[in-house]
């Protein structure tokens, strides 16, 4: 995931590659401290056996205009950090919710990436729009109620399949829509990088180094 244009103030337009955002300017040290403290507090709250209604509110933090607040707090955090990782999980779910049909088409196109990755992603078959929302919600839920590293590995696998789907669509579009094909290829590259970042975060979490 690399920096994209500032579109987080328009949450209805959410392509699969929208997983990095540039937050408004502020004191970098203060902003970083606030981002990390907020991420730590949210993770502690979610993993402390909270009531179902509180867990539901945590899962839906990025719903509606909440994405803007999260972007201002977390979007400039390093990819392999607790706030940067949470940002990616929330944006992944929000992006899917806003265009589940597109994501399901990309997932179907990318299922050939490899059997293990598809299994780890854990998407029900056939992978329709409802299944896309279900899996990204389950990933966030698992981050709070299960093994955090496993949730990140599942998110990484999901991103890898989508990236493969984007690459497949790019190949199909090359002959008649070269510009669109290049855009898909770049999106695929960014999402594959996101998957790698999530795996690195999972490893850091297991070693108690994800902060």
Residue spans of the language-model regions?
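Histidine (H) residue identity feature
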Residues: 8-9, 30-31, 36, 169, ...
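Arginine residue identity/basic-tract feature
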Residues: 6, 21, 44-47, 57, ...
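N-terminal domain-start signal
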Residues: 1-94
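Generic structural signal for hydrophobic core residues of well-folded globular domains
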Residues: 42, 46, 61-65, 74-78, ...
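Helix-driven interaction modules
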Residues: 106-202
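Long, charge-patterned amphipathic interaction tracts in eukaryotic proteins
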Residues: 50, 68, 75-134
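Short, charged, intrinsically disordered terminal tails
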Residues: 3-6, 198-211
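Acidic-enriched, low-complexity/disordered segments with a strong bias for Aspartate over Glutamate
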Residues: 20, 27, 53-56, 63-65, ...
């Amino acid at each position: 995931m690399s920096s994209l244009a500032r579109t987080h103030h328009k949450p209805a337009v959410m392509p699969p590659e929208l997983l990095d955002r540039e937050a408004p300017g502020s004191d970098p040290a203060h902003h970083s401290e606030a981002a990390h403290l907020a991420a730590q507090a949210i993770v502690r709250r979610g993993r402390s056996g909270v009531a179902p209604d509180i867990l539901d509110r945590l899962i839906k933090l990025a719903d509606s205009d909440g994405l803007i607040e999260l972007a201002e707090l977390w979007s400039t955090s390093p990819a392999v950090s607790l706030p940067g990782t949470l940002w990616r999980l929330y944006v992944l779910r929000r992006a899917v919710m806003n265009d589940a049909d597109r994501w399901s088409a990309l997932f179907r196109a990318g299922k050939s990436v490899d059997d293990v990755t598809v299994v780890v992603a854990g998407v029900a078959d056939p992978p329709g729009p409802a299944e896309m929302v279900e899996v990204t919600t389950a990933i966030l839920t698992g981050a709070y109620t299960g093994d955090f590293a496993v949730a990140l590995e599942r998110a990484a696998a999901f991103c890898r399949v989508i990236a493969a789907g984007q690459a497949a669509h790019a190949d199909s579009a090359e002959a008649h829509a070269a510009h669109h094909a290049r855009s898909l290829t770049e999106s695929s590259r960014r999402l594959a990088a996101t998957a790698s970042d999530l795996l690195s975060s999972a490893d850091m979490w297991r070693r108690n180094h994800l902060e």
